[in-house]
């Protein structure tokens, strides 16, 4: 081999090797499976209940059944408390299912 071939090989070797300064290291992804796609980035987080929860954030308000504070909501308006959701409705039998959507 001639000296020019050796010089070219040396230049090629220097051009293809990259010495990175560890102080300026950028984390590299070694597998394409670790790259987040747009669908992975946009996932909704589940609402998690905290320990000793008092805010009831995790409960579904649509499926909760109202429980009377005073216990006399079925008797009619004169016996209902001020925050009663049954206010304005006629008296009903205790234990009857009341659907507000039909009103």
UniProtKB/Swiss-Prot annotation:
Record-given protein name: Fe-S cluster assembly protein DRE2
Binding residues for [4Fe-4S] cluster: 70, 73, 81, 84
Motif placement: Cx2C motif 2: 81-84
Quaternary data: Monomer. Interacts with TAH18. Interacts with MIA40.
Cellular compartment(s): Cytoplasm; Mitochondrion intermembrane space
GO cellular component terms given for this protein: mitochondrial intermembrane space
Top-rank taxon: Eukaryota
Bilayer-spanning residue ranges: none
Sorted UniProt keywords: 4Fe-4S, Cytoplasm, Iron, Iron-sulfur, Metal-binding, Mitochondrion
Gene responsible for this protein: DRE2
One of the Pfam families matching this protein, by short name: CIAPIN1
Stretch list, region Fe-S binding site B: 70-84
Single GO BP term: iron-sulfur cluster assembly
Intervals of motif Cx2C motif 1: 70-73
Principal localisation: cytoplasm
Family named by the database record: Belongs to the anamorsin family.
Record: residues binding [2Fe-2S] cluster: 42, 50, 53, 55
Chain positions covered by the region annotation Disordered: 19-103
Keyword Metal-binding set for record: yes
GO molecular function: 4 iron, 4 sulfur cluster binding; metal ion binding
Function, in words: Component of the cytosolic iron-sulfur (Fe-S) protein assembly (CIA) machinery required for the maturation of extramitochondrial Fe-S proteins. Part of an electron transfer chain functioning in an early step of cytosolic Fe-S biogenesis, facilitating the de novo assembly of a [4Fe-4S] cluster on the scaffold complex CFD1-NBP35. Electrons are transferred to DRE2 from NADPH via the FAD- and FMN-containing protein TAH18.
Region (Fe-S binding site A): 42-55
Domain remark in the UniProt entry: The C-terminal domain binds 1 Fe-S cluster but is otherwise mostly in an intrinsically disordered conformation.
Cofactor(s) listed in the protein's UniProt record: [4Fe-4S] cluster
Organism: Enterocytozoon bieneusi (strain H348)
């Amino acid at each position: 081999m001639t000296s020019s071939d050796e010089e070219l090989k040396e230049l090629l070797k220097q051009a293809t090797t990259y010495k990175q300064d560890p102080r300026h290291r950028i984390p590299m992804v070694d597998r394409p499976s670790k790259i987040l796609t747009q669908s992975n980035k946009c996932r909704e987080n589940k609402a998690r209940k905290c320990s000793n929860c008092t805010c009831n954030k995790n409960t579904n308000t649509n499926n909760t059944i109202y429980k009377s504070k005073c216990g006399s909501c079925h008797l009619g308006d004169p016996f209902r408390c001020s925050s009663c959701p049954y206010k304005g409705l006629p008296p009903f039998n205790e234990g009857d299912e009341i659907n507000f959507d039909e009103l």
